[in-house]
Amino acid sequence: MNHLNKLMERLGHQFNNLELLKIALTHRSSGADNNERLEFLGDSVLGFIIASELYQRRPQAREGDLSRMRASMVNGDELAQMSTKLGINEYLQLGVGEQKSGGKRRRSILADALEAIVGSIYIDAGLETCRRCVLNWYGERVDDLSKLSPKKDAKSLLQEWLQARRLPLPTYEVKITGEAHAQTFTVNCYVKGLPHKTEGVNTTRRRAEQIAAKRFLELLDDGKGDGITERDQ
């Protein structure tokens, strides 16, 4: 019995070309034939599928709201959680160094692998099969799309807060540490003329910026950060 059969059962698709799934599970630290190209494709396919569902289910929503709702569905945290739920982490092929550093639990690797699998299903069986799989993974969240609230991210809210008061836009200073396969991003956020300075630390630059922006808002107005998401944009 092929060791990938259980995973294919969870994914809801039996691959015609099993090599596509194997590549989708192979991180760049493991060798040259890795999942980066499939991830690139899968990112676009996944975004299209969710955008299409939102367009159909939210006919009155504005473009900006649709974009924010899509972002909440395909951000790194959401994809990493889904990847773990599907058990993709159990099948990842990583280099020795990446394995030792806990790569099978790393959010970015899990999210990238899920996108690569989306790309592999799209190539293997086409858009409709891929759509069916993706919507099945999201489960009840798909049904909730018609009720989804378009929350703004912290960076957008901070920019709006400053613009409303005719203040300069924030500056985000980024410091990168660690090896290429395990980088840490430290972002400092400040606004010229204001005394505050906040820091956000994460394994992705975008999320570190969101964390720093959320903390800055909380300093500007106690409670301002309530309900603000720190998701990737």
From Swiss-Prot:
It comes from the Bacteria. It is found in: Cytoplasm. SUPFAM superfamilies: dsRNA-binding domain-like, RNase III domain-like. GO terms for biological process: mRNA processing; regulation of gene expression; rRNA processing; tRNA processing. Disulfide bonds: none annotated. It catalyses: Endonucleolytic cleavage to 5'-phosphomonoester. Pfam families: dsrm, Ribonucleas_3_3. Residues 153-222 form the DRBM domain. Mg(2+) binds at residues 39, 112, 115. The active site is at 43, 115. GO terms for molecular function: double-stranded RNA binding; metal ion binding; ribonuclease III activity; rRNA binding. Residues 4-126 form the RNase III domain. Its EC number is 3.1.26.3. PROSITE patterns: DS_RBD, RNASE_3_1, RNASE_3_2. Keywords: Cytoplasm, Endonuclease, Hydrolase, Magnesium, Metal-binding, mRNA processing, Nuclease, RNA-binding, rRNA processing, rRNA-binding, tRNA processing. Its cofactor is Mg(2+). Its main location: cytoplasm. GO terms for cellular component: cytoplasm. Signal peptide: none annotated. The keyword RNA-binding applies. PANTHER family: RIBONUCLEASE 3 (PTHR11207:SF0), RIBONUCLEASE III (PTHR11207). Homodimer. Belongs to the ribonuclease III family. Digests double-stranded RNA. Involved in the processing of primary rRNA transcript to yield the immediate precursors to the large and small rRNAs (23S and 16S). Processes some mRNAs, and tRNAs when they are encoded in the rRNA operon. Processes pre-crRNA and tracrRNA of type II CRISPR loci if present in the organism. HAMAP family: RNase_III. This is Ribonuclease 3. The gene is rnc.
